[in-house]
């Protein structure tokens, strides 16, 4: 996957603003979240991945958030961004569960979290669901 990194200030511009404050970006929320990213040490983002939202490619989208590639302290990481319409008020519980899974070597390694973001190890490769489907087919 080609990784073109942009400064996190790119989130201020259309269409990237829809990723940091999905689904309805507002300037005040975008500014607040960019400050939050800076405090976490995130400097750059890359809009690449198999999923397309608006005109942006991202790694993933779910019920709680969107996942993009980012740089934190010059290291490539996966950045989960809490959706503004998420029923969860923060990423604390998700971070806690990831730390528990990490204790038995499951999942990407937890790095850091804040109210709206979860930073974890980026593992380049096949999605686990796709791998499992292939393995199931081979087993038959």
Describe the residue ranges of each PLM region:
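Ser/Thr- (and often Asn-) enriched beta-sheet segments in non-cytosolic proteins
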Residues: 52, 71, 122-124
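Juxta-kinase regulatory segment immediately upstream of eukaryotic protein kinase catalytic domains
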Residues: 2-57
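A conserved alpha-helical element in kinase catalytic cores
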Residues: 81-114, 135
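ATP-binding glycine-rich loop module of kinase domains
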Residues: 57-92
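Conserved structural core of kinase catalytic domains
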Residues: 108-139
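Generic structural signal for beta-strand residues in well-ordered domains
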Residues: 46, 60, 72, 100-103, ...
């Amino acid at each position: 996957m080609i990784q073109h990194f942009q400064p996190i200030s790119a989130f201020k511009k259309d269409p990237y603003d829809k990723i940091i404050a999905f689904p309805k970006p507002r300037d005040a929320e975008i500014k607040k979240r960019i400050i939050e990213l800076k405090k976490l040490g995130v400097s750059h983002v890359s809009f690449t991945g198999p999923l397309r939202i608006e005109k942006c490619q991202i790694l993933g989208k779910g019920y709680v958030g969107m996942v993009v590639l980012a740089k934190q302290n010059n290291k490539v990481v996966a950045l989960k961004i809490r959706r503004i319409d998420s029923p969860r008020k923060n990423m604390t519980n998700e971070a806690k569960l990831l730390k528990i899974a990490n204790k038995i070597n499951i999942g990407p390694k937890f790095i850091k979290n804040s109210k709206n973001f979860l930073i974890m190890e980026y593992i380049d490769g096949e999605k686990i669901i796709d791998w499992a489907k292939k393995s199931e087919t081979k087993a038959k």
